[in-house]
Amino acid sequence: MSNAVKTNKRILALDILRGVTIAGMIMVNNPGTWAHIYAPLRHAEWNGLTPTDLVFPVFMFIMGISTYISLKKYNFEFSHAAGIKILKRTILIFLIGMAIGWFSKFCYYWTSPTEGISFGTQLWESVWTFDRIRILGVMQRLALCYGATAIIALTMKHKNIPYLIATLLTGYFILLLCGNGFAYNDTNILSIVDRTILTPAHMYKDNGIDPEGLLSTIPAIAHVLLGFCVGRMMLEGGKANEDRESMLNSHLIKLFLVGTILTFSGFLLSYGCPINKKIWSPTFVLTTCGLASSFLALLIWIIDVKGYKKWSLFFESFGVNPLFMYVLGGVLSILFGSICFPWGESSISIHTFLYKILLMPIFGETGGSLAYALLFVGINWCIGYQLYKRKIYIKI
Protein backbone atom coordinates (compact mmCIF):
# COMPACT_ATOMS: atom_id res chain seq x y z
CA MET A 1 0.00 0.00 0.00
CA SER A 2 1.31 3.45 -0.83
CA ASN A 3 2.32 5.86 1.88
CA ALA A 4 -0.61 7.76 3.34
CA VAL A 5 -0.45 11.48 3.70
CA LYS A 6 -0.03 12.29 7.37
CA THR A 7 -1.05 15.60 8.86
CA ASN A 8 -1.23 16.91 12.38
CA LYS A 9 -4.50 18.65 11.68
CA ARG A 10 -7.77 17.25 10.45
CA ILE A 11 -9.37 18.70 7.35
CA LEU A 12 -11.96 21.02 8.85
CA ALA A 13 -13.87 21.29 5.57
CA LEU A 14 -15.02 17.67 5.98
CA ASP A 15 -16.72 18.51 9.29
CA ILE A 16 -18.22 21.67 7.83
CA LEU A 17 -19.68 19.99 4.73
CA ARG A 18 -21.03 17.21 6.92
CA GLY A 19 -22.57 19.85 9.18
CA VAL A 20 -24.08 21.72 6.22
CA THR A 21 -25.81 18.55 5.06
CA ILE A 22 -27.16 17.68 8.54
CA ALA A 23 -28.47 21.22 9.07
CA GLY A 24 -29.91 21.08 5.55
CA MET A 25 -31.69 17.79 6.17
CA ILE A 26 -33.18 19.08 9.42
CA MET A 27 -34.34 22.27 7.68
CA VAL A 28 -36.01 20.65 4.66
CA ASN A 29 -37.67 18.00 6.85
CA ASN A 30 -39.27 20.58 9.14
CA PRO A 31 -41.16 23.34 7.31
CA GLY A 32 -43.91 25.21 9.09
CA THR A 33 -46.34 23.52 6.71
CA TRP A 34 -45.82 21.16 3.79
CA ALA A 35 -48.49 23.07 1.86
CA HIS A 36 -46.32 26.20 1.56
CA ILE A 37 -42.66 25.63 0.71
CA TYR A 38 -40.34 27.58 -1.60
CA ALA A 39 -39.54 25.56 -4.73
CA PRO A 40 -35.79 25.03 -4.02
CA LEU A 41 -36.73 23.49 -0.67
CA ARG A 42 -38.91 20.81 -2.27
CA HIS A 43 -37.72 17.47 -3.55
CA ALA A 44 -38.15 16.88 -7.27
CA GLU A 45 -41.52 15.22 -7.77
CA TRP A 46 -39.91 12.51 -9.92
CA ASN A 47 -37.11 13.12 -12.45
CA GLY A 48 -34.82 16.10 -11.92
CA LEU A 49 -32.72 17.62 -9.18
CA THR A 50 -33.32 20.43 -6.68
CA PRO A 51 -30.98 21.81 -3.98
CA THR A 52 -32.98 19.80 -1.44
CA ASP A 53 -32.20 16.58 -3.32
CA LEU A 54 -28.49 17.15 -2.70
CA VAL A 55 -28.27 17.17 1.09
CA PHE A 56 -28.70 13.44 1.77
CA PRO A 57 -26.46 12.14 -1.05
CA VAL A 58 -23.73 14.66 -0.19
CA PHE A 59 -23.80 13.38 3.39
CA MET A 60 -23.49 9.81 2.11
CA PHE A 61 -20.52 10.82 -0.04
CA ILE A 62 -18.82 12.33 3.01
CA MET A 63 -19.67 9.16 4.95
CA GLY A 64 -17.68 7.23 2.37
CA ILE A 65 -14.64 9.47 2.92
CA SER A 66 -15.07 9.18 6.69
CA THR A 67 -15.27 5.39 6.40
CA TYR A 68 -11.91 5.40 4.64
CA ILE A 69 -10.40 7.50 7.42
CA SER A 70 -11.90 5.39 10.22
CA LEU A 71 -10.78 2.06 8.73
CA LYS A 72 -7.17 3.14 8.31
CA LYS A 73 -6.52 2.08 11.91
CA TYR A 74 -7.20 -1.52 10.86
CA ASN A 75 -4.74 -1.15 7.99
CA PHE A 76 -7.72 -2.16 5.82
CA GLU A 77 -7.35 -5.78 6.91
CA PHE A 78 -10.37 -7.74 8.05
CA SER A 79 -10.29 -9.10 11.58
CA HIS A 80 -12.80 -10.54 14.02
CA ALA A 81 -12.68 -7.34 16.11
CA ALA A 82 -13.19 -5.11 13.06
CA GLY A 83 -16.06 -7.25 11.78
CA ILE A 84 -17.84 -7.22 15.14
CA LYS A 85 -17.44 -3.45 15.46
CA ILE A 86 -18.83 -2.85 11.97
CA LEU A 87 -21.74 -5.22 12.60
CA LYS A 88 -22.60 -3.60 15.93
CA ARG A 89 -22.56 -0.10 14.44
CA THR A 90 -24.64 -1.18 11.46
CA ILE A 91 -27.28 -2.77 13.71
CA LEU A 92 -27.26 0.21 16.09
CA ILE A 93 -27.85 2.78 13.34
CA PHE A 94 -30.55 0.60 11.78
CA LEU A 95 -32.38 0.11 15.09
CA ILE A 96 -32.20 3.82 15.90
CA GLY A 97 -33.96 4.49 12.60
CA MET A 98 -36.63 1.94 13.50
CA ALA A 99 -36.96 3.45 16.98
CA ILE A 100 -37.59 6.92 15.56
CA GLY A 101 -40.32 5.45 13.37
CA TRP A 102 -41.89 3.71 16.37
CA PHE A 103 -41.69 6.87 18.50
CA SER A 104 -43.44 8.86 15.78
CA LYS A 105 -46.27 6.32 15.62
CA PHE A 106 -46.52 6.17 19.41
CA CYS A 107 -46.85 9.94 19.77
CA TYR A 108 -49.40 10.12 16.95
CA TYR A 109 -51.70 7.44 18.35
CA TRP A 110 -51.27 8.64 21.94
CA THR A 111 -52.23 12.23 21.11
CA SER A 112 -54.97 11.23 18.62
CA PRO A 113 -56.72 8.28 20.29
CA THR A 114 -59.78 6.53 18.93
CA GLU A 115 -62.82 8.13 20.50
CA GLY A 116 -64.43 6.24 23.37
CA ILE A 117 -61.66 3.71 24.04
CA SER A 118 -60.31 2.93 27.50
CA PHE A 119 -56.93 4.09 28.80
CA GLY A 120 -55.52 0.57 28.52
CA THR A 121 -56.66 0.22 24.92
CA GLN A 122 -55.25 3.63 24.06
CA LEU A 123 -51.92 2.68 25.62
CA TRP A 124 -51.84 -0.63 23.74
CA GLU A 125 -52.73 0.96 20.39
CA SER A 126 -50.00 3.56 20.92
CA VAL A 127 -47.28 1.12 21.97
CA TRP A 128 -48.00 -1.78 19.63
CA THR A 129 -47.52 -0.26 16.20
CA PHE A 130 -44.95 -2.73 14.89
CA ASP A 131 -47.41 -4.02 12.31
CA ARG A 132 -47.30 -0.65 10.52
CA ILE A 133 -43.84 0.81 11.18
CA ARG A 134 -41.79 1.66 8.11
CA ILE A 135 -38.86 -0.77 8.02
CA LEU A 136 -36.50 1.24 5.83
CA GLY A 137 -35.66 4.93 6.01
CA VAL A 138 -32.78 7.40 6.08
CA MET A 139 -30.97 5.95 9.11
CA GLN A 140 -31.56 2.41 7.88
CA ARG A 141 -30.08 3.27 4.49
CA LEU A 142 -27.05 4.82 6.17
CA ALA A 143 -26.63 1.66 8.24
CA LEU A 144 -26.80 -0.73 5.29
CA CYS A 145 -24.51 1.39 3.11
CA TYR A 146 -21.97 1.87 5.89
CA GLY A 147 -21.92 -1.83 6.73
CA ALA A 148 -21.55 -2.92 3.11
CA THR A 149 -18.87 -0.32 2.34
CA ALA A 150 -16.84 -1.15 5.44
CA ILE A 151 -16.88 -4.89 4.77
CA ILE A 152 -15.97 -4.39 1.10
CA ALA A 153 -13.15 -2.02 2.09
CA LEU A 154 -11.65 -4.63 4.44
CA THR A 155 -12.04 -7.65 2.17
CA MET A 156 -11.44 -6.36 -1.35
CA LYS A 157 -8.40 -4.86 -3.03
CA HIS A 158 -9.01 -1.13 -3.21
CA LYS A 159 -7.85 -0.90 -6.81
CA ASN A 160 -10.79 -3.15 -7.76
CA ILE A 161 -13.49 -1.13 -5.98
CA PRO A 162 -14.05 1.25 -8.97
CA TYR A 163 -14.85 -1.82 -11.10
CA LEU A 164 -17.33 -2.97 -8.47
CA ILE A 165 -18.96 0.48 -8.48
CA ALA A 166 -19.26 0.40 -12.28
CA THR A 167 -20.73 -3.12 -12.13
CA LEU A 168 -23.30 -2.16 -9.49
CA LEU A 169 -24.43 0.96 -11.35
CA THR A 170 -24.53 -0.74 -14.76
CA GLY A 171 -26.40 -3.75 -13.39
CA TYR A 172 -28.87 -1.49 -11.61
CA PHE A 173 -29.47 0.50 -14.81
CA ILE A 174 -30.22 -2.72 -16.70
CA LEU A 175 -32.61 -3.71 -13.91
CA LEU A 176 -34.41 -0.37 -14.23
CA LEU A 177 -34.67 -0.72 -18.01
CA CYS A 178 -36.01 -4.26 -17.88
CA GLY A 179 -38.25 -3.75 -14.87
CA ASN A 180 -40.08 -0.54 -15.80
CA GLY A 181 -37.90 1.12 -13.18
CA PHE A 182 -38.46 4.66 -14.41
CA ALA A 183 -42.24 4.50 -13.96
CA TYR A 184 -43.69 6.50 -11.08
CA ASN A 185 -46.26 3.89 -10.07
CA ASP A 186 -46.63 0.45 -8.54
CA THR A 187 -45.68 -1.34 -11.78
CA ASN A 188 -42.08 -0.30 -11.08
CA ILE A 189 -39.84 -3.28 -10.26
CA LEU A 190 -38.63 -1.43 -7.15
CA SER A 191 -42.19 -1.13 -5.89
CA ILE A 192 -43.01 -4.75 -6.71
CA VAL A 193 -40.00 -6.06 -4.76
CA ASP A 194 -40.66 -3.78 -1.77
CA ARG A 195 -44.36 -4.66 -1.64
CA THR A 196 -43.54 -8.36 -1.88
CA ILE A 197 -40.83 -8.43 0.78
CA LEU A 198 -41.60 -5.49 3.07
CA THR A 199 -45.39 -5.36 2.43
CA PRO A 200 -47.20 -2.02 1.90
CA ALA A 201 -47.84 -1.51 5.63
CA HIS A 202 -44.09 -1.17 6.23
CA MET A 203 -43.33 1.14 3.28
CA TYR A 204 -43.28 4.86 2.62
CA LYS A 205 -46.42 5.91 0.76
CA ASP A 206 -45.48 7.61 -2.53
CA ASN A 207 -47.18 6.08 -5.57
CA GLY A 208 -45.93 2.70 -4.43
CA ILE A 209 -42.30 3.88 -4.41
CA ASP A 210 -40.23 3.78 -1.22
CA PRO A 211 -37.30 6.20 -1.77
CA GLU A 212 -35.13 4.16 0.61
CA GLY A 213 -36.33 0.79 -0.67
CA LEU A 214 -34.49 -2.51 -1.00
CA LEU A 215 -33.27 -2.48 -4.61
CA SER A 216 -32.34 1.22 -4.60
CA THR A 217 -29.95 0.41 -1.75
CA ILE A 218 -27.67 -1.17 -4.39
CA PRO A 219 -26.72 2.14 -6.09
CA ALA A 220 -26.67 3.81 -2.67
CA ILE A 221 -23.89 1.40 -1.65
CA ALA A 222 -22.04 2.31 -4.85
CA HIS A 223 -22.57 5.96 -3.85
CA VAL A 224 -20.77 5.52 -0.52
CA LEU A 225 -18.07 3.43 -2.19
CA LEU A 226 -17.45 6.36 -4.55
CA GLY A 227 -16.92 8.56 -1.50
CA PHE A 228 -14.55 5.93 -0.12
CA CYS A 229 -12.53 5.94 -3.36
CA VAL A 230 -12.33 9.74 -3.32
CA GLY A 231 -11.10 9.57 0.28
CA ARG A 232 -8.42 7.09 -0.78
CA MET A 233 -7.41 9.27 -3.71
CA MET A 234 -7.13 12.30 -1.43
CA LEU A 235 -5.23 10.76 1.44
CA GLU A 236 -2.99 8.12 -0.11
CA GLY A 237 0.07 8.41 -2.26
CA GLY A 238 1.37 11.71 -0.90
CA LYS A 239 4.98 12.46 -0.11
CA ALA A 240 6.05 11.81 3.47
CA ASN A 241 7.68 15.25 3.79
CA GLU A 242 4.92 17.14 1.97
CA ASP A 243 3.85 20.29 3.82
CA ARG A 244 0.21 20.90 4.69
CA GLU A 245 -0.34 23.67 2.12
CA SER A 246 1.01 21.56 -0.73
CA MET A 247 -1.11 18.63 0.42
CA LEU A 248 -4.27 20.74 0.51
CA ASN A 249 -3.59 22.20 -2.93
CA SER A 250 -3.16 18.65 -4.19
CA HIS A 251 -6.55 17.79 -2.66
CA LEU A 252 -8.15 20.71 -4.47
CA ILE A 253 -6.89 19.67 -7.89
CA LYS A 254 -7.94 16.05 -7.42
CA LEU A 255 -11.37 16.90 -6.03
CA PHE A 256 -12.20 19.48 -8.70
CA LEU A 257 -11.08 17.09 -11.44
CA VAL A 258 -13.13 14.19 -10.07
CA GLY A 259 -16.08 16.48 -9.39
CA THR A 260 -16.07 17.85 -12.93
CA ILE A 261 -15.81 14.41 -14.55
CA LEU A 262 -18.56 12.85 -12.42
CA THR A 263 -20.95 15.80 -12.73
CA PHE A 264 -20.48 16.08 -16.49
CA SER A 265 -20.90 12.31 -16.89
CA GLY A 266 -24.07 12.32 -14.80
CA PHE A 267 -25.72 15.12 -16.74
CA LEU A 268 -24.61 13.71 -20.10
CA LEU A 269 -25.93 10.22 -19.35
CA SER A 270 -29.18 11.64 -17.96
CA TYR A 271 -30.52 11.82 -21.53
CA GLY A 272 -30.78 8.03 -21.41
CA CYS A 273 -31.00 7.49 -17.67
CA PRO A 274 -32.93 10.27 -15.87
CA ILE A 275 -31.53 11.80 -12.69
CA ASN A 276 -33.94 10.58 -10.04
CA LYS A 277 -33.52 10.59 -6.27
CA LYS A 278 -36.51 8.38 -5.46
CA ILE A 279 -35.04 5.44 -7.36
CA TRP A 280 -31.42 6.55 -6.72
CA SER A 281 -30.66 6.28 -10.42
CA PRO A 282 -27.03 5.76 -11.55
CA THR A 283 -26.94 9.29 -12.98
CA PHE A 284 -28.16 10.61 -9.63
CA VAL A 285 -25.16 8.88 -8.03
CA LEU A 286 -22.68 10.32 -10.52
CA THR A 287 -24.08 13.85 -10.48
CA THR A 288 -24.45 14.23 -6.72
CA CYS A 289 -21.05 12.65 -6.00
CA GLY A 290 -19.52 15.01 -8.54
CA LEU A 291 -21.16 18.05 -6.99
CA ALA A 292 -20.19 16.85 -3.50
CA SER A 293 -16.56 16.52 -4.59
CA SER A 294 -16.61 20.04 -6.01
CA PHE A 295 -18.30 21.46 -2.89
CA LEU A 296 -15.66 19.81 -0.71
CA ALA A 297 -12.86 21.24 -2.84
CA LEU A 298 -14.39 24.71 -2.55
CA LEU A 299 -14.69 24.43 1.23
CA ILE A 300 -11.11 23.16 1.59
CA TRP A 301 -9.93 26.20 -0.36
CA ILE A 302 -12.03 28.63 1.71
CA ILE A 303 -11.49 27.09 5.15
CA ASP A 304 -8.29 25.06 5.20
CA VAL A 305 -6.22 26.98 2.62
CA LYS A 306 -7.40 30.57 3.01
CA GLY A 307 -8.31 30.22 6.68
CA TYR A 308 -11.77 31.83 6.45
CA LYS A 309 -13.35 29.73 9.16
CA LYS A 310 -15.15 32.03 11.61
CA TRP A 311 -18.42 31.66 9.69
CA SER A 312 -18.21 27.87 9.86
CA LEU A 313 -18.68 27.44 13.63
CA PHE A 314 -22.44 27.11 13.20
CA PHE A 315 -22.08 24.13 10.86
CA GLU A 316 -19.16 22.60 12.75
CA SER A 317 -21.46 22.13 15.74
CA PHE A 318 -23.60 19.87 13.52
CA GLY A 319 -20.65 18.24 11.77
CA VAL A 320 -18.81 16.88 14.81
CA ASN A 321 -21.91 15.00 16.03
CA PRO A 322 -23.70 14.39 12.72
CA LEU A 323 -25.85 11.32 13.34
CA PHE A 324 -26.73 12.39 16.88
CA MET A 325 -27.84 15.79 15.60
CA TYR A 326 -29.94 14.19 12.87
CA VAL A 327 -31.60 11.90 15.41
CA LEU A 328 -32.11 14.84 17.76
CA GLY A 329 -33.82 16.76 14.96
CA GLY A 330 -36.14 13.84 14.28
CA VAL A 331 -37.07 13.40 17.94
CA LEU A 332 -37.64 17.12 18.53
CA SER A 333 -39.77 17.32 15.40
CA ILE A 334 -42.01 14.55 16.74
CA LEU A 335 -42.23 16.18 20.17
CA PHE A 336 -42.99 19.64 18.75
CA GLY A 337 -45.88 18.16 16.81
CA SER A 338 -47.17 16.08 19.72
CA ILE A 339 -46.80 18.16 22.88
CA CYS A 340 -49.82 20.43 23.31
CA PHE A 341 -50.75 23.12 25.81
CA PRO A 342 -53.98 25.06 26.46
CA TRP A 343 -54.64 27.93 24.05
CA GLY A 344 -57.97 29.69 24.21
CA GLU A 345 -60.79 27.18 24.32
CA SER A 346 -58.70 24.31 22.95
CA SER A 347 -55.11 23.10 22.94
CA ILE A 348 -52.31 23.73 20.46
CA SER A 349 -49.03 21.97 19.66
CA ILE A 350 -45.65 23.67 19.96
CA HIS A 351 -45.25 23.38 16.18
CA THR A 352 -48.61 24.99 15.44
CA PHE A 353 -48.06 27.74 18.00
CA LEU A 354 -44.67 28.73 16.60
CA TYR A 355 -45.79 28.64 12.98
CA LYS A 356 -49.38 29.86 12.98
CA ILE A 357 -49.40 32.14 16.02
CA LEU A 358 -45.89 33.62 16.00
CA LEU A 359 -44.35 33.40 12.53
CA MET A 360 -47.13 33.27 9.93
CA PRO A 361 -48.64 36.66 10.92
CA ILE A 362 -45.21 38.26 10.42
CA PHE A 363 -43.80 36.44 7.37
CA GLY A 364 -46.89 35.04 5.66
CA GLU A 365 -47.63 31.41 4.89
CA THR A 366 -44.58 30.52 2.79
CA GLY A 367 -42.16 32.90 4.49
CA GLY A 368 -43.41 31.75 7.87
CA SER A 369 -42.92 28.13 6.85
CA LEU A 370 -39.28 28.85 6.04
CA ALA A 371 -38.88 30.92 9.21
CA TYR A 372 -40.14 27.99 11.27
CA ALA A 373 -37.65 25.63 9.58
CA LEU A 374 -34.79 28.04 10.30
CA LEU A 375 -35.94 28.52 13.89
CA PHE A 376 -36.10 24.76 14.34
CA VAL A 377 -32.55 24.38 12.99
CA GLY A 378 -31.47 27.11 15.42
CA ILE A 379 -33.01 25.26 18.37
CA ASN A 380 -31.12 22.12 17.38
CA TRP A 381 -27.93 24.14 16.98
CA CYS A 382 -28.23 25.48 20.54
CA ILE A 383 -28.04 21.92 21.82
CA GLY A 384 -25.31 20.92 19.37
CA TYR A 385 -23.21 23.95 20.24
CA GLN A 386 -23.30 23.13 23.94
CA LEU A 387 -21.98 19.66 23.14
CA TYR A 388 -19.34 21.11 20.82
CA LYS A 389 -18.23 23.69 23.38
CA ARG A 390 -17.81 20.99 26.02
CA LYS A 391 -16.02 18.71 23.52
CA ILE A 392 -18.72 16.07 23.91
CA TYR A 393 -18.74 13.85 20.84
CA ILE A 394 -21.53 11.28 20.69
CA LYS A 395 -20.59 8.52 18.29
CA ILE A 396 -23.33 6.51 16.66
Predicted regions and their residues:
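Alpha-helical transmembrane segments and their immediate juxtamembrane cytosolic regions
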Residues: 1-396
